[in-house]
């Protein structure tokens, strides 16, 4: 993609609870747009965990949707991961490379102010579809309990209110991947 005389190298942030299609959308956008890199915040969490311990950072060593208080757990993890996530974004900016960062840890309070090509919060689909997506192709070995699913729905409600508060668009992924890709191609920020 060219933007003027230089290649356009967008940075895209995709937030949302588990099962909203973040990984699938990121993969499709990379293919459609020829983007250079994609990373999920779950993988960033795994790297940070490798430099810590359950004694030092107990909240890092479990899924947010398995916590007794999933919202508090998500906020703690998100705050702890922010320096590592920002390092990835800053490296992409410094090197002039395109990047998609996707994951539940991209809270609007922490990232809505960033100058990126697009920042969207993916919405959970209706309940039965959401339950089925939680064990979809990008997480084939993940086992989900009814409690995990209910917590993922709570996180979705929290992220919806945060997206509204910070002016981050919330999108339900259906057959609209081309529309999202076009928004990124044009370099039109998804937030104000």
Model-derived regions, located:
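The conserved Walker
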Residues: 17-18
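Hydrophobic positions on the alpha1 helix immediately C-terminal to the Walker A/P-loop
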Residues: 25, 29
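Conserved glycine(s) of the Walker
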Residues: 21
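Conserved nucleotide-sensing/catalytic segment adjacent to the nucleotide-binding pocket
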Residues: 37, 49-97
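A glycine- and Lys/Arg-enriched "phosphate-lid" helix/loop adjacent to the NTP-binding pocket
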Residues: 117-158
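Hydrophobic anchor at the beta1->P-loop junction of P-loop NTPases
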Residues: 14
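Post-Walker A helix-loop "phosphate-sensing" segment adjacent to the P-loop in P-loop NTPases
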Residues: 30-41
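NTP-dependent small-molecule kinase module
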Residues: 157-192
